[in-house]
Amino acid sequence: MRQNLKNSRLRLGAVAVEMAVCAPFLFLMVVGLLELSRMTQVQQILTNAAREGARLAAQGLIINSTGSSTQIFVNSGTPSVQSMVKDTIARAGLTNTNVIVNFQTLTGTPVTEPYLATKGQQFLITVTIPYADVNTINFNLFSPSSLTSKATMVSLVDDPFTINTSLPTN
């Protein structure tokens, strides 16, 4: 009986040493997984926001509630590509104050605003947010300086046309 008590005390000491050696690695793994999961979540939110912004930019012009057309701009106007992206990010629960939205044409004549694009012209919306604004653990184990997402679409702006005001007669 005495020997079992001595062995169990030695075993308890070995368990404590093993835990002291393994705990830092387990802690780093858990924190790394949490940070990687958050990074993946934010990346998915940015991808969705870029897609929503590209979808709006693809329209170029929209018909507002009064029946007149409204031009789609990147940074100004209502709605704008930037406001659509920021609203999508805010609805997901992230801060959107330092979000950067860029619009770039990939084909055809370069234009600076979505409403100036021609039908079928391909463009790219890039959304960037500083990772420090969205991470929940300030451990900075794997964290990049910023996260970026891109969405490519083609312009759906209608071809310009004129209406013949004189009707044909028989």
What positions do the PLM features span?
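Alpha-helical transmembrane segments of integral membrane proteins
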Residues: 22-35
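Short, conserved structural patches
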Residues: 2-3, 43, 48, 52-170
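Conserved G/P- and acidic residue-centered "switch" motifs that form tight phosphate/ATP-binding loops
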Residues: 18, 35, 50
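N-terminal signal-anchor/signal peptide hydrophobic helix marking the start
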Residues: 11-25
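Alpha-helical structural signal
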Residues: 17, 27-30, 42
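N-terminal leader/signal peptides at the extreme start of proteins
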Residues: 1-12
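Transmembrane signal-anchor/signal-peptide helices with a preference for the extracytoplasmic
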Residues: 35-44
